[in-house]
C-alpha cells in the first residue's frame, strides 16, 4: 500500500474516533446470562458490549454473522435479543463453546438428567492407561480424577454433547476446590506449586470427585438463564474464514478477529484442547494470529464476502485489538480500514470507538501487548 494512502486514511481514521460508552467499563459478571460463563476463553468480548452492539446495529429477526466467534458471546446475545446467529471459528474449543451455549438443554432439570446419564455411561468404561497420557497432562491431576475425566470426555465426544463437555472443560483446572485439577490458574493452565506446596497443602492434592463438581457447575450455568429460542435460529461452522461460505444475505456482522501476535490461543487452552483431541499438538497454530500478511489476506477474504452478502443499510462491526508499542502505520485498525476500502467499496466507515483495556481485564497482568481496542463501525450504502 502506498504511504500517502495510509497517511490519508489514518487522518480520516482519527477524525472518527470517539470513546466507548462509560458503562462498557463496568463489570457484568454478576448480571450477564450465566451461560456466558460455561468455560473461560482468553480475549473474549464482554457480554455487555456484545449486547449493546447487537441492540444498536440490528433489529429483532435479523441474521447476525460472527466469523471469528470464539466463545460465542455475540451469538448468544443475538439469540437472547430475538435475532438469529451464523457463526464460525477454526478452533475446536470455540466450536464446543458456541454449540453448548446456542443449543443448551431447555431447562436445568433436563441438563442434570443428561449429566447423570452421561456419568453413568462413563463409569461403565474401562479405566484408561495413564502411561499413554502425556506427562504434562498427568501432572495436573490425581490419577483417579484423571481417569474419571478422560472417561467422561470420551462419552461427551461420542454422544456429541457439547453442553456437558463445555461444563466439564469449565471445571478442568483452577485452585479452588470445585475444580478437578491440582491448584492451578483458571484461564491459562499453570500449576501453582510455589503458592500451594504439596507438603503444606496435602488436601489440595487428593482425589477430586467429578460428579458433584459437574452438577454444581451445571446449576451455576442456569443461575441466570432465560429461555433461549434455539430451533433453527443458529448455525455454527468449524472452519477457517477463508474457506467459509457466508449466508447469501445477512443483516449485520459483529466480530473480533484474533489478537495477532498478542495471544497464543492454542498454548493458553492446551489442557482443554488435549481433552478435546488427545492427538492435539501444542505447536499447531492458526497462522492468522502469527503473521501480519496472513492476517491481512484473511481480512481481505472476509470483507469481499461481506461486500457481496451484507444487506444494504446493514452494519459491519470489526473489533480490533491494538498494540500501543506498535508504530502508527502498523496499527491493525488502519490495515483493516484500508483493506475494506480496497475490497469492499460499499462499506463506509461510520465511526470508530476506542476502548483502553485496564490491567484488571487482562489474562496476564504483566503483559504489555494489547492495550486498547478499536470498534470499527462500517455501514453498507
Kindly give the residue locations of the regions a language model identified.
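A short glycine-rich, Lys/Arg-flanked "PGG" loop and its adjoining helix->strand segment in the class I
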Residues: 296-312
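SAM-dependent nucleic-acid methyltransferase catalytic core
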Residues: 146-255, 260-261
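S-adenosyl-L-methionine
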Residues: 1-60
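Short glycine-centered segments of the SAM/dcSAM-binding site in methyltransferase folds
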Residues: 63, 314-317
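Class I S-adenosyl-L-methionine
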Residues: 333, 337, 344-381
Amino acid at each position: 500500500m502506498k504511504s500517502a494512502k495510509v497517511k490519508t486514511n489514518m487522518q480520516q481514521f482519527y477524525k472518527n474516533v470517539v470513546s466507548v460508552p462509560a458503562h462498557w467499563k463496568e463489570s457484568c459478571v454478576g448480571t450477564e446470562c450465566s451461560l456466558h460463563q460455561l468455560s473461560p476463553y482468553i480475549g473474549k468480548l464482554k457480554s455487555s458490549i456484545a449486547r449493546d452492539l447487537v441492540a444498536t446495529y440490528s433489529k429483532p429477526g435479523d441474521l447476525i454473522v460472527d466469523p471469528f466467534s470464539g466463545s460465542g458471546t455475540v451469538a448468544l446475545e443475538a439469540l437472547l435479543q430475538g435475532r438469529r446467529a451464523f457463526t464460525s471459528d477454526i478452533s475446536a474449543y470455540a466450536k464446543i463453546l458456541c454449540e453448548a451455549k446456542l443449543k443448551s438443554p431447555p431447562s436445568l432439570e433436563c441438563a442434570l438428567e443428561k449429566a447423570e446419564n452421561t456419568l453413568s455411561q462413563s463409569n461403565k468404561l474401562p479405566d484408561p492407561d495413564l502411561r499413554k497420557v502425556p506427562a504434562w497432562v498427568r501432572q495436573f491431576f490425581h490419577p483417579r480424577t484423571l481417569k474419571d475425566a478422560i472417561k467422561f470426555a470420551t462419552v461427551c465426544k461420542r454422544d456429541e454433547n457439547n453442553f456437558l463437555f463445555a461444563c466439564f472443560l469449565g471445571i478442568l483446572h483452577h485452585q479452588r476446590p470445585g475444580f478437578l485439577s491440582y491448584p492451578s490458574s483458571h484461564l491459562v493452565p499453570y500449576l501453582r506449586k510455589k503458592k500451594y506446596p504439596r507438603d503444606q497443602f496435602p488436601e489440595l492434592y487428593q482425589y477430586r470427585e467429578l460428579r458433584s463438581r459437574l452438577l454444581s457447575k451445571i446449576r451455576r450455568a442456569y443461575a441466570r438463564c432465560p429461555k433461549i429460542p434455539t430451533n433453527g435460529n443458529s448455525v455454527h461452522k468449524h472452519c477457517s474464514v477463508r474457506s467459509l461460505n457466508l449466508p447469501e444475505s445477512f443483516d449485520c456482522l459483529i466480530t473480533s478477529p484474533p489478537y495477532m501476535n498478542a495471544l497464543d490461543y492454542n498454548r493458553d487452552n492446551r489442557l482443554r484442547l488435549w481433552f478435546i483431541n488427545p492427538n492435539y499438538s501444542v505447536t499447531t497454530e492458526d497462522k492468522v494470529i502469527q503473521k501480519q500478511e496472513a492476517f491481512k489476506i484473511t481480512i481481505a477474504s472476509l470483507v469481499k464476502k461481506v461486500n457481496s452478502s451484507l444487506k444494504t443499510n446493514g452494519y459491519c462491526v470489526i473489533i480490533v485489538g491494538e498494540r500501543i508499542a506498535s508504530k502508527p502505520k502498523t496499527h491493525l485498525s488502519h490495515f483493516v480500514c484500508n483493506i475494506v476500502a480496497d475490497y469492499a467499496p460499499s462499506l463506509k466507515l461510520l465511526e470508530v470507538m476506542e476502548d483502553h483495556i485496564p490491567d484488571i481485564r487482562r489474562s496476564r497482568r504483566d503483559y504489555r501487548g494489547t492495550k486498547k481496542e478499536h470498534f470499527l463501525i462500517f455501514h453498507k450504502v
